[in-house]
C-alpha cells in the first residue's frame, strides 16, 4: 500500500505497510491523515458558507458593508408579531406593575426593567428580587438555588464582591443598550422555511445579557398553547434553579464570557468585533436521496477515525457536528451537560440561537458559523469543570466570521435500542444527516467532523450511526473525521469495516440493502422473542461482513460492484491523472446537491409524516410533541406492529386476532410501515393527539431530557403577558 501523488491512499492491494494508514499502531487514529481530510489544503481554505449578503432569505442585523468595528446596527421599523422576536424594549411590551396599596397598573415592561436594574444590587437576594419584580407571576416559583450557591458558597468573598461591584453592573449596562444595539426586528427561524440571520457579536452579547437578566417576554410559561411552546427557552431562570456541580461550572463559563465581552464604563476595547450567521435548512422529502439507488462508493470517503481528541479541538476548518436536541441547546439552561450543552457554554454566542430558532423538524438542520470560543474545560457530564480562559485564534472570513462552522442535527431518542434498526427510522437518520451535511457552494465542501451522534442518553448504536454518517458523506463527496471519544475497540472496528468497503468496492446502495436485510432480521427476532431483542452492536458488523462475503462468492458480482463504484454521487467526473488509482477522491469538484430547498412552502412534509401539518398555529401547538413524546409515540407504534406480527404468527382463530392481522397486513397483504402504523394508532384513539407530558422525561439524563425539565408544574403557571 502506498500514498498516491495527491496525498490520498492508493487502492489496498495487500496488507503490507499498515503504517501508511496511521503512523503507527500506537497512534490514536486510523485511516487517512488530517491533511487528507483537508484535501491537502490549508485547514481554513475551503468555506462552509458564502459571504454575508442581505436579501429576502438572509436578514442582516448590522449595516453592510462593514465600515467600522464593531458593525453599526441596521435600522428598520420595529415589528410586534408572531414572525419576529418580541423584544422587552418594544413599546407594545407591557406588564402589570404592583402598587404599594396592592393594586396593579399596566406599565411599559422596559421601564420596569430599567427601574429594577438601575437600583443598587449588592447581594444575590437583591438580584433575584430585581428579576422577580418584572416577572411577578413567578414570585412563588422561582428560587435561584444555583445562583445563590455559586455566589454565596462556591466563590470566595473577593470573587463575589468583584461580581457585584464590577461584572454585574457591566452586564446590566450592556443589557439596557438593547434599544440602541437592536434597531430592526429579529426574525424567527421557523418550521419549513429556509432562512439566514446574521448578527454582530456585540448584538449577541446584548441579547444574552438580557437572557441572563430574564427580560424576554412570553418565554417563561410552560403552557402547551403558549406562543413559544415550540421554541427553546432563552431566559436563564431555569439554569439558576437547577442543581448539581455541572450547573455551577456552566454558570462559571457564562460569567467568564461576560467578563470577556462586556465593556467597562471607560474602556470598550474588549467589545468583540465579528459577526455570526445562523442558517435554518428545510428540505422537501420528495427531493431527498433514494438511498437504494446511490452508487457512491463508501471506500472513496477519506476516513480519519480517532479515539482521542474532540470535535471542537481537532475538527478545525471542518463542518463540526452538534449532537443536538431538536430544541436547540438541549438542557444547556438546565441540568444537561453533555456534548451539545458543553459546546454552547464554551461558545456562548450559540445560545442566542435559542431565542429565534423553532424546534427542528425531521428534515431540518441549523448551521451556525462564526461563534467564538471563550473557555477551556475538563470532564464531561457530572465531571464537567470550567478550566479557565481560551483565546480563539480561528481566522475570520471575508464577512468577519470566525471560520468555525457547526451544524445542529437531532437524532431520534430510542427507549428500546432495537427500534433504531427499523428501515423507517434508519432512513430518517440518513435524511437528517443529509440535510445537515449538504453543501450549497460550488467550491469543494470541507470535511465533516463528527462522532457518536445520538448515542449515550439517546440510546443510539454508535456502530450503526457511524455507517449512516459514512453513507451520507459518500453521497455528498465529503471527507469524514470521526472521533470515538476514547473507544479504541470501536475505532478499530469502524476502520476495519471501511477497509472492507474499499477492498470490495461497496456502494451506498449495497450497504443500504444489507442494513434493510438486517432490519428485517431484527424485526423477525423481535416478533418471535419480543422481550429479548438483543441486537448486538458487534452482530451488526458481523452480519455486514457475511453479506459482503456472499456477494464476493457469487460469480459476476465483483464486476458489478466495481462498475457501481465508478462514480460517486456528489463528486465530479474524471480522476486526476496523477492519482488515477487513489481511492479517496480528494480533489474532485462536488456536483450540485440533489435536493431542493424552498422558501416558505407550507407543505414540506407529507401528511403521513407529520401530525402538525396544519396551517393553524393553534393546531400546530396542540399537535406538537416534545422530544421524548415524539420518539415514544414512534417506538410505541413499532411495538404495536411487533405485537401484531406475533399475533399473526400465532395464527389465532379468534375474530379479534383475525381483525388485527387484516389491519396489520393491509390491502394486498402489504405490511404497514411504522409511520402508517403510527397514524392508525392515533386514529384509533390509542394515543391522544393532544400534547401531554412524557412519562419518561424524568428518567432521561443530559440532552435526552425534555426542554420542559424544570422544578415547577404546569398547573402552577400563569400567563406572563398582558400585551
UniProtKB/Swiss-Prot annotation:
Q: Name one GO molecular function term.
A: ADP-ribosylserine hydrolase activity
Top-tier EC class: hydrolase
Question: Which reactions are catalysed by this chain?
Answer: [(1''->2')-ADP-alpha-D-ribose](n) + H2O = [(1''->2')-ADP-alpha-D-ribose](n-1) + ADP-D-ribose
Its cellular-component GO annotations read:
cytoplasm; nucleoplasm; nucleus; site of DNA damage
UniProt-listed InterPro entries: PARG_cat_C (IPR046372), PARG_helical (IPR048362), Poly_GlycHdrlase (IPR007724)
- Carrying Phosphoserine, the residues are 24, 28, 579, 582-583
- What EC number is given for this enzyme? 3.2.1.143
- Write out the ranges of the annotated region (Disordered): 1-23, 554-593, 609-723
Low complexity biased stretches: 632-664
Q: Bias category Basic and acidic residues: which stretches?
A: 702-718
Instruction: Return the Polar residues bias intervals.
Output: 577-586, 609-619
Effect of inactivating the gene: Progressive neurodegeneration. Knockdown of Parg leads to decreased survival when animals are exposed to stress with either hydrogen peroxide or environmental hypoxia.
Name the domain of life. Eukaryota
Which GO annotations describe the biological process of this protein?
A: ATP generation from poly-ADP-D-ribose; Cajal body organization; carbohydrate metabolic process; DNA damage response; female germ-line stem cell population maintenance; heterochromatin formation; maintenance of protein location in nucleus; nucleotide-sugar metabolic process
Establish whether keyword Secreted is in the entry: no
Q: What keywords were assigned to this record? A: Hydrolase, Phosphoprotein
Question: Its biological function?
Answer: Poly(ADP-ribose) synthesized after DNA damage is only present transiently and is rapidly degraded by poly(ADP-ribose) glycohydrolase. Poly(ADP-ribose) metabolism is required for maintenance of the normal function of neuronal cells.
Q: Which family does it belong to?
A: Belongs to the poly(ADP-ribose) glycohydrolase family.
Q: What is this protein called?
A: Poly(ADP-ribose) glycohydrolase
Instruction: State the organism's lineage.
Output: Eukaryota, Metazoa, Ecdysozoa, Arthropoda, Hexapoda
Which gene does this sequence derive from?
Parg
